[in-house]
Swiss-Prot record:
Protein source organism: Burkholderia lata (strain ATCC 17760 / DSM 23089 / LMG 22485 / NCIMB 9086 / R18194 / 383)
Phylogenetic lineage: Bacteria, Pseudomonadati, Pseudomonadota, Betaproteobacteria, Burkholderiales
Protein name in UniProt: Putative phosphoenolpyruvate synthase regulatory protein
Example of a GO MF term: ADP binding
Protein function: Bifunctional serine/threonine kinase and phosphorylase involved in the regulation of the phosphoenolpyruvate synthase (PEPS) by catalyzing its phosphorylation/dephosphorylation.
Binding-site residues, ADP: G151, V152, S153, R154, S155, G156, K157, T158
Catalytic activity line of the entry: [pyruvate, water dikinase] + ADP = [pyruvate, water dikinase]-phosphate + AMP + H(+); [pyruvate, water dikinase]-phosphate + phosphate + H(+) = [pyruvate, water dikinase] + diphosphate
InterPro entries: Kinase-pyrophosphorylase, PSRP
Length: 271
């Protein structure tokens, strides 16, 4: 029986879930994850306790609960459940209150009240930019890009571009390197003026073949020998052009994005 882990939040639960994944990944154990977002009333807190207790009875062991509930009364209710409750909010807020000699607002959703701020607008603009400049579909306003990702098809450019835009407000374009570029031995002409904005993504040829076979099974596009050729040529071109690059094979989107931000020295963040 897999241990049941509850992610309990008065908001979306994204913060709690991200933290929980980081902690749980340290253990060689699979878990059953149950997300309980928007617990913003006492009634919902009591209903959550019922779910947790039912899971404990079913599993024959205490559940594990990661909570970011701001309301202390709701938090106290959840803490009375048959579970190991890891209160992420209080764990950090109380020491900060002591250190800063200030009381926190304890207001629900405080981290999402900036919907009309410049940061939010910047993020929306970045998302629209990344969508418009996905896979080289537009060369307009490339000068506005914070970074232009290059690499062969299916090397992770699109999800990385969108993650950079959504999470950090980074205007990330992406451009595919194709066999015609390798035959010419040059980058696409549209990128020539933006060499300082380029960052490359590569990938293990075998993994690339597997991904491409999901899209076009049995095609030359997905053939292992073609994938090896494209990767070898792309990496040679990036070295020749002095483009910083990394392999996306064993990295998460979060790791790739963080590395890119460090390499291009962009200090932009949306909250």
């Amino acid at each position: 029986m897999l241990p049941t882990v509850f992610i309990v939040s008065d908001g979306t639960g994204i913060t709690a879930e991200t933290f929980a994944h980081s902690i749980l990944s340290q253990f060689d154990q699979k878990f059953r994850l149950v997300r309980v977002p928007f617990v913003d009333s006492l009634d919902k807190a009591y209903a959550t306790v019922e779910k947790i207790n039912e899971a404990a009875v079913h599993d024959g062991r205490r559940a594990i609960v990661f909570t970011t509930l701001v309301d202390s009364e709701s938090n106290d209710i959840v803490k009375r459940s048959n579970a190991l409750v890891l209160d992420m909010f209080q764990r950090f807020v109380e020491p900060l209150e002591q250190e800063l000699e200030l009381k926190s607002s304890h207001a629900m959703g405080r981290g999402h009240q900036n919907a009309d701020t410049e940061e939010y607008k910047t993020r929306i603009e970045a998302i629209n930019f990344s969508l418009a400049h996905d896979d080289g579909q537009s060369n307009r306003n490339l000068s506005e890009a914070d970074v232009i990702l290059v690499g062969v098809s299916r090397s992770g450019k699109t999800p990385t571009s969108l993650y950079l835009a959504m999470q950090y407000g980074v205007k990330a374009a992406n451009y595919p390197l194709i066999p015609e570029d390798f035959e010419r031995g040059k980058l696409p002409s549209a990128l020539a003026a933006y060499s300082e904005k380029l960052f490359g993504l590569s990938i293990d040829p075998q993994r690339l073949s597997e991904i491409r076979n999901e899209r076009r099974p049995g095609s030359k596009y997905a053939a292992p020998e073609n994938c090896r050729y494209e990767i070898n040529e792309a990496e040679a071109m990036m070295r020749r052009e002095g483009i910083k690059w990394l392999s996306s094979t064993h990295k998460s989107i979060e790791e790739i994005a963080t590395t890119i931000l460090q390499e291009i020295r962009l200090d932009r963040q949306s909250y």
